[in-house]
């Protein structure tokens, strides 16, 4: 096999690969054996005709497709390895020469991983944000705990709807005098003042009593997300079925004992403050790492192939689809609710995808230049963490082995990138 390489443009190369005629003839014979049973030739039982008879009857190229596939699948990876290329997409194959008794010559045009030009990535300056825990922060946590443990009780007979009440309602909506999809519900639980419903819908229920009905008039936002409703005035027929109210528990030592391991409210507050401080430290660390990485990436020069960005967007869409699935939705529903489309979402994701790809390439460059590697022990430790998340149980060791076997390269790359980030942070300078 002979190969030639031509650089078409940045990150695109064309390989011309010559497969010797002997190899190509072997591939044709292999294709004959694979397909002979498909051919009917007069004078021969089906599947028994010799190769030369079949080619005479059906034409010289009858076995070329399979032979080409065989040769390309064998020769292309060898050429890639010979020229030390890192393809990021499937090659575009074109036939240059093919025929009986001839060498098989083809070209493979392929997009390769781009070269990153990066200098002076040590000692970058980045802003370090700091966050203090205030008494208000602790109070918010306590209030959330009180809300979570609140009792929902029915208000006394004759009481009217007030802000923060929970109104159980039936409603039916109309736009242009016609009921619309999703505009009707029975026994809907609506907390007044949360802004769950559009416009001033909730405010118009204040003062109503059980059994009373009201016509509520609102306007849908211009960007509501449904073309047939955007900016339209709407009328809702609403009936109050029941009025409930949250009864918060007393914030005392008994409450602290019920919801935590602590005997007093003061001890509970101290614990909440400690946890908030830990969360803030982690936030500061993550934000500083991101600031350092962003500064390093700004110093890097790299021309990212469009296909790498598109593949990253594909992954982001799959992640979105998975998260929507947890909510019982799919992408089609998401596009409808957000008045969008796949093309619009892909365009919206493009900037983030490009940033993620560039970060990956920059970290890869630093890993290579600094000779950073993940040890076997680190890979196994990460696999153990994953096994625990999967709930390995008694077969944890086997699960760890399976994870290492299937994802060794991925884990090694993740760990090396994490070490590269640590390296950049350790060699950076904090600025206020």
Curated annotation (Swiss-Prot):
A GO term (biological process) for this protein?
A: chaperone-mediated protein folding
* E.C. numbers: 5.2.1.8
Please give the chief subcellular localization of this protein. Answer: cytoplasm
Looking at the record's lineage, which domain of life comes first? Bacteria
Q: Which GO terms describe its molecular function?
A: peptidyl-prolyl cis-trans isomerase activity; protein folding chaperone; ribosome binding
Q: Where in the cell is it found?
A: Cytoplasm
Instruction: Quickly give the catalysed reaction.
Output: [protein]-peptidylproline (omega=180) = [protein]-peptidylproline (omega=0)
Keywords, in A-Z order: Cell cycle, Cell division, Chaperone, Cytoplasm, Isomerase, Rotamase
GO CC list: cytoplasm
Please state every residue range assigned to the domain named PPIase FKBP-type.
164-249
What Pfam families does UniProt report for this protein, alphabetically? FKBP_C (PF00254), Trigger_C (PF05698), Trigger_N (PF05697)
Family, per entry: Belongs to the FKBP-type PPIase family. Tig subfamily.
Let me see what the UniProt entry remarks about domains: Consists of 3 domains; the N-terminus binds the ribosome, the middle domain has PPIase activity, while the C-terminus has intrinsic chaperone activity on its own.
Q: Which purpose does this protein serve, as stated in its record?
A: Involved in protein export. Acts as a chaperone by maintaining the newly synthesized protein in an open conformation. Functions as a peptidyl-prolyl cis-trans isomerase.
**What PANTHER family does this protein map onto?**
TRIGGER FACTOR CHAPERONE AND PEPTIDYL-PROLYL CIS/TRANS ISOMERASE (PTHR30560), TRIGGER FACTOR-LIKE PROTEIN TIG, CHLOROPLASTIC (PTHR30560:SF3)
Protein name per UniProt = Trigger factor
Which gene carries the instructions for this protein? tig
């Amino acid at each position: 096999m002979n190969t030639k390489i031509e650089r078409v443009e940045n990150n695109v190369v064309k390989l011309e690969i010559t497969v010797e005629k002997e190899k190509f003839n072997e591939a044709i014979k292999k294709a004959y054996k694979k397909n002979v049973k498909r051919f009917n030739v007069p004078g021969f039982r089906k599947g028994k005709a010799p190769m030369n008879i079949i080619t005479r009857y059906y034409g010289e190229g009858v076995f070329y497709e399979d032979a080409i596939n065989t040769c390309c699948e064998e020769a292309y990876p060898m050429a890639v390895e010979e020229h030390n290329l890192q393809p990021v997409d499937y090659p575009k194959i074109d036939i240059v020469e093919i025929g009986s008794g001839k060498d098989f010559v083809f070209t493979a045009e392929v997009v390769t991983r781009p070269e990153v030009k990066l200098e002076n990535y040590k000692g970058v300056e980045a802003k370090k944000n700091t966050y203090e825990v205030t008494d208000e922060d602790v109070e918010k946590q306590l209030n959330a705990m009180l809300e979570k443990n609140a009792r929902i009780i029915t208000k006394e007979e004759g009481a009217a709807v007030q802000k923060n009440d929970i109104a159980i309602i039936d409603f039916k909506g109309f736009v242009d005098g016609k009921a619309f999809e999703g505009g009707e519900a029975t026994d809907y639980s609506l907390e007044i003042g949360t802004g769950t419903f559009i416009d001033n819908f909730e405010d118009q229920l204040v003062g109503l009593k059980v059994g009373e009905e009201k016509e509520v008039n609102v306007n849908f936002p211009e960007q509501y997300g449904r073309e047939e409703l955007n900016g339209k005035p709407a009328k809702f027929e609403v009936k109050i079925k029941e009025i409930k109210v949250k009864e918060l528990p007393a914030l005392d030592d008994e409450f602290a004992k019920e919801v935590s391991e602590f005997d007093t409210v003061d001890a509970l507050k101290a614990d909440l403050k400690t946890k908030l401080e830990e969360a803030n430290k982690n936030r500061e660390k993550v934000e500083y790492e991101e600031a350092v990485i962003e500064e390093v990436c700004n110093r890097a020069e790299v021309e990212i192939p469009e296909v790498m960005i598109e593949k990253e967007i594909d992954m982001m869409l799959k992640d979105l689809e998975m998260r929507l699935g947890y909510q019982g939705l799919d992408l089609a529903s998401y596009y409808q609710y957000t008045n969008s489309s796949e093309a619009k979402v892909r365009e919206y994701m493009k900037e983030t995808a490009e940033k993620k790809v560039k970060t990956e390439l920059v970290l890869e460059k630093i890993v290579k230049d600094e000779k950073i590697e993940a040890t076997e022990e680190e890979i196994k430790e990460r696999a153990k963490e994953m096994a625990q998340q999967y709930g390995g149980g008694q077969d944890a060791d086997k699960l760890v082995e399976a994870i290492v076997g299937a994802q060794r390269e991925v884990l090694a790359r993740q760990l090396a990138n994490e070490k590269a980030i640590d390296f950049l942070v350790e060699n950076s300078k904090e600025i206020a």
